[in-house]
């Protein structure tokens, strides 16, 4: 299983769907159009990434440091 994750708080690189939240000590606030999600500090859990059409792409390694 792979997990989507959030980058640093405040960056627009949340890879979550619906009301699911990301790990790394951040949670996701969804944008109104689904494309302006933001990471904010807060409790969160990793979200299992599905393998269906329309999946989010994995975050590049440089964002996970």
Curated annotation (Swiss-Prot):
Report if keyword Disulfide bond is assigned.
yes
Question: Quick one: where's region Disordered?
Answer: 39-65
Q: Which intervals of the chain are annotated as region Interaction with thrombin active site?
A: 1-3
InterPro entries the record matches: Hirudin, Hirudin/antistatin, Prot_inh_hirudin
User: Quick one: where's region Interaction with fibrinogen-binding exosite of thrombin?
Assistant: 55-65
User: In which compartments does the protein localize?
Assistant: Secreted
Disulfide bridge partners, by residue number: 6-14, 16-28, 22-39
Keywords of the record, alphabetical order, are: Disulfide bond, Glycoprotein, Protease inhibitor, Secreted, Serine protease inhibitor, Sulfation
Keyword Secreted in annotation = yes
Q: Where is the composition biased (Acidic residues)?
A: 55-65
The family note in this entry says: Belongs to the protease inhibitor I14 (hirudin) family.
The protein in question is named Hirudin-2'
Q: Which organism is it from?
A: Hirudo medicinalis
Please name the taxonomic classification of the source: Eukaryota, Metazoa, Spiralia, Lophotrochozoa, Annelida
